[in-house]
């Protein structure tokens, strides 16, 4: 899909489908803006008959109004004093999704005077493209409806020289993350994830290292391998490196949880635990690899970025880890496994230690780690923890710019008491109360405390069961845009 602009006299514009945004204010003068496709007086009469006043989220659709236009969709944006970027993005996203089956090209005209920057235009373009996303890989009968190929913005005089190149690159990263998360577990295996990572490296000139089980054993990754040994599929520890040309001013590690399927192990997932959905337990690694794809194309200056994924399955066989086993992580700390379904933090323990040994300035890990965060924050907001106020503030700012909502949670040190073990350095789970906090406290034990760190729990945000805003039902690709924006802000 491509983005384009039409900056010439609108009387010369030609198109089939137009989305037109209006404010909840005097309608007649706003309709004058589209006199190039229809008589404003005729349109005002039709709009008035529908009692449409531009209320936020309300839409009107007109077919074949004029020979110059097949479809006109008018979307209400609400009062100008209440107008915000998120509302515009969600409104346009919902409309694009409704029209993609009918059009190869959609044109958009909005009250651009209320858009404050090129970044906001780019993010609006992101929203339109990501709303139009479809995944038909596993359908026997391919979709024979039209495929949206172009989104055109009309009359962007305020932003004449705008470029959508980075916008497309970021969207490609999000779309990759969505495809990875949505892929069934017999399709996206640890082996396939390593192939996808290697392809990113090949396409964008990244260094790639894939560690096999023996390599991980040599590094002492007893926590990660304890999870992996219950599966007949070999684990793959993935490490991509993106190095900027010229002097490196900062080194960063992005770590993603990579469970391509999580049965729960001997603490088997049952009942409402949604075992059938546990293909998305690699949502963190999908975000990291999606960011690698986008950043590999963007090539930010002055940075060395490491993308790390400890990929495996959590399954049950004769070799699977038992509840009560004690394992040793690669930093030498011992862990009593009191719950085999708290496996993600075990894989992350060794992944974070590996990242820490690279001596980065910052580490950010993303993981579908706990159900507790879903109870706390629902499905629209991801929780995050950080040991550094500057990093936390930068991450919050990036998430706000990217339109992915984060909420900072406390690293409540008193809760570490719940992780104490009588026979090992710690247990892998604490009490039920505060479960997402104790999970973060567990992770904090596996990297140099001098390194700035943030942990993002995306268990509630990596998937949606229904169309919502810019996300069609299914995988959301949550986290890619925030990571990329955080890097771009450097």
From Swiss-Prot:
GO cellular component term, pick one: cytoplasm
GO molecular function, one term: manganese ion binding
Stored SUPFAM superfamilies: Macro domain-like (SSF52949), Zn-dependent exopeptidases (SSF53187)
Free-text remark on how the cofactor is bound: Binds 2 manganese ions per subunit.
Residues noted as binding Mn(2+) 1 in the record, renumbered to the chain: 262, 341, 343
Keyword field contains Chaperone: no
Required co-factors: Mn(2+)
Residues annotated as catalytic: 269, 345
Enzyme Commission designation: 3.4.11.1, 3.4.11.10
Chief subcellular location: cytoplasm
Database matches in NCBIfam families: PRK00913.1-2 (NF002073), PRK00913.1-4 (NF002074), PRK00913.2-3 (NF002076)
Protein name in UniProt: Probable cytosol aminopeptidase
Organism ancestry: Bacteria, Bacillati, Cyanobacteriota, Cyanophyceae, Synechococcales
